[in-house]
């Protein structure tokens, strides 16, 4: 196994070129790269080729819970309980797309995205201010929730689900391969426990190794 923090765009283009010479032609910045927060874990297969088994990122967006608990008001006039959600999380789409390009020849996609913060609620919560006032955060508020901006990365499939195995969809005379990120959110906006994150990442990495089974056969059966 090996761990890497980043992947060069040049390597991604080379992987695309191996599939079809028309792909991976464009590169303007020679040293361009991507750097997912959690990096990449790879295994060397029986043919000495490095194969990705896990890519992970953790993103926090929305500090409304923390601000309310501290009694901090927000907004230009400092008179609001809630701050309108931003778009910073959408940067994750770039890394997901690039790893999908790198793994286009594979039949699995072990990209895990962990989300926390008030912009990723899946349930309505109530938070108490220091003065005792209760503030309600609605999970389906267009002002707060940004989950719908990320589910494009998993084709609107379920969140909090291991989607590592690619889905092959038949439509009319075509078969379409879907590479979907596995998106996990706490739901209540709170921070992730490291053990829960580890268990999820372990499950996804295990799925990757299962998908690579025939290419790891000699190592698995080595006495």
Predicted regions and their residues:
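Acidic, metal/cofactor-coordinating or nucleic-acid-engaging core segments within structured domains
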Residues: 67-168
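Basic, amphipathic N-terminal segments that precede the first structured/catalytic domain
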Residues: 1-49, 195, 199-202, 206-223
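Short, conserved acidic/polar surface loops in the N-terminal third of protein domains
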Residues: 49-52, 65-69
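Glycine-rich, flexible loop segments associated with nucleotide phosphate handling
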Residues: 26-32, 50-53, 76-89
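Conserved catalytic cores of phosphodiester-cleaving nucleases, focusing on short active-site segments
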Residues: 38-40, 52-60, 92
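Charged, low-complexity C-terminal accessory regions
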Residues: 130-223
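Short loop/turn segments at strand-loop or loop-helix junctions that form parts
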Residues: 55-63, 113-117
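Residue-level recognition of the N-termini of beta-strands and the immediately preceding loop/turn
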Residues: 1, 50-53, 107-110
